[in-house]
Amino acid sequence: MLRTIKSPIKVIVRPASASASANAEKLDEIRERLAKGPSFQDFIQNPNNTKNEWDNYDGKLRREKVEEQRLRLPPWLKTTIPMGKNYAKIKDQLRELKLSTVCEEARCPNIGECWGGGEHGTQTATIMLMGDTCTRGCRFCSVKTARAPPPLDENEPVNTAKAVASWGLDYIVLTSVDRDDLSDGGSKHIAQTVKEIKARNQNIFVECLVPDFRGDLECVKTIANCGLDVYAHNIETVEKLTPFVRDRRAHYRQTLKVLSEAKRFNPNLITKSSIMLGLGETDAEVEQTMLDLREVGVECLTLGQYMQPTKKHLKVIEYVTPEKFKHWEERGNQLGFLYTASGPLVRSSYKAGEFFITSILANRKKQNDAPK
């Protein structure tokens, strides 16, 4: 339960010693900083917010590299508190089956909408396979890291399939942590999960957001040919920033190679990637990244605002405006992406795109099933 303290905090200063006086001054300083900083309400969506209020927002949107102060959250990034029957139902089932989701581990701002159903009334959860601990330490990600995570749960593929079947979904997203400690990077485990899901429902569309498997093309082939419909692998940021944003084992060109080879192994796949904005990239660099993705055949692209998950992670350099995100959506369409989802709260697994991708896949299935 959240409790609001209406009366100001009273500080009693006893003139006992110099240290007591110093402590009082320190406390006053903290109170002043709290008064000027964001409150809990700053992170909750205001239903009365309108586009005009966004246009009139005069807060600072870009931080210089020498500045230590974090930027204040602009109104278009405020979201609602997750709640509702659907949200509680999915959360309880995940706990019961000991499954992890990237929705929780990565602190996704859309968790309330996706799990609760949102305006479309469709529940969507992105299940994170192979545990909640990653062998890599990307500087933007809040997922736990370790050199040797716990061993894989051999029951996870079946448990995941059971959960998906009970939800009655048309589209499911599977993602995973990186498991560089495993010889195959966990590719066979992911592939088995897809097969278990498809065995229970052949009509469900499965998207896998997978690691780069250290560039091992046999692992990429295993995933590409396991029966999934959408092969997703995120490029995350522009080439120049990659060494500073992603783990040192992740490489820009390696990501492009993985996406290219996945398409070569299975031309019927839809390939998908994602770019975070607000890390200090230039427009020219974003444009080049989009061109690079199109060159290797990527068909679906998402662009969203990077948001610092904790104080230990990279600070936001810039809050990109909704208008700028709209520009990138239009540019993506011009470059030939089948689908471009671009917005401040858009994430690689955001369900908004799944409705469109489902339509593409359904049409392809009809064409393939039609008598020749």
Swiss-Prot record:
Residues 119-338 form the Radical SAM core domain. It is an enzyme of class 2 (transferase). Transmembrane segments: none annotated. Keywords: 4Fe-4S, Iron, Iron-sulfur, Metal-binding, Mitochondrion, S-adenosyl-L-methionine, Transferase. Its EC number is 2.8.1.8. Its cofactor is [4Fe-4S] cluster. Its main location: mitochondrion. It is found in: Mitochondrion. PROSITE patterns: RADICAL_SAM. GO terms for cellular component: mitochondrion. [4Fe-4S] cluster 1 binds at C103, C108, C114, S349. It comes from the Eukaryota. Pathway: Protein modification; protein lipoylation via endogenous pathway; protein N(6)-(lipoyl)lysine from octanoyl-[acyl-carrier-protein]: step 2/2. The keyword S-adenosyl-L-methionine applies. [4Fe-4S] cluster 2 binds at C134, C138, C141. One of its GO terms (molecular function) is metal ion binding. This protein may be expected to contain an N-terminal transit peptide but none has been predicted. Belongs to the radical SAM superfamily. Lipoyl synthase family. This is Lipoyl synthase, mitochondrial. It comes from Drosophila willistoni. The lineage of its organism: Eukaryota, Metazoa, Ecdysozoa, Arthropoda, Hexapoda.
